[in-house]
Regions:
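A solvent-exposed, acidic/Ser-Thr-rich amphipathic alpha-helical stretch
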Residues: 41
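Short, aliphatic-rich beta-strand segments
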Residues: 27-36
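C-terminal interaction segment
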Residues: 1-9, 14-18, 22, 33, ...
């Protein structure tokens, strides 16, 4: 369900901060988008992805983070489920740029509406993961736009940023890379 408040009362925002409910809220050109808590399945898959990919990311010199703000300005930021960025993009408030963002889909979320924002920041890839069936979509930056990548002959997708090949099988999402693999 969507609701629109023309003006969000400061006391509502303060209460969300006090209760810790604002951690996933986003600001889109000065407009607050209050994101509901993720499901348990969503959280577990996000954690599994972070655990599986963090050692690889670190070896490649990339900083992995979970639910970290990606900022274009103080009143314009998104909170992807996972972010992989270079150390120089890490800031006190979150990240000021990224090489790869991962969005785990939830019913009615705004994942695809974020494509232009991420492209404007120069995000090289966006991986969209569907927790229910563990399928993935990959978008790659081409001429300032994040465009969908077609699956390879095996039906999988390969992230150039991390060098990870993603395929979906009956037993889950398979990730493989030079020297390792994981099934989630």
């Amino acid at each position: 369900m969507r609701g629109v408040l023309v003006e969000v009362p400061e006391q509502m925002l303060a209460e969300r901060r006090r209760l810790g409910l604002d951690g996933r809220d986003e600001m889109w050109d000065g407009v607050v988008h209050m994101v509901p808590p993720a499901s348990g399945r969503h959280q577990r898959l996000g954690s599994e992805l972070l655990v599986a990919l963090s050692p690889l990311a670190k070896r490649l010199g990339t900083v992995p983070s979970y639910e970290t703000g990606l900022f274009r300005g103080a009143d314009d930021y998104r909170v992807p489920d996972l972010i992989f960025c270079r150390a120089e993009h890490v800031s006190d408030r979150g990240a000021e740029g990224a090489d790869l963002v991962v969005e785990l889909r939830s019913p009615g979320d705004e994942t695809y509406a974020k494509l232009d924002f991420y492209a404007a920041l120069g995000v090289r890839e966006m991986l969209v993961v569907h927790p229910g069936d563990r399928t993935v979509e990959l978008f790659r930056l081409v001429e300032a736009r994040l465009l969908p990548v077609s699956p390879d002959a095996e039906g999988g997708l390969r992230s150039d940023v991390l060098g990870v090949h993603c395929t979906t099988h009956d037993d889950g999402l398979h990730l493989s890379w030079d020297g390792g693999s994981a099934t989630l």
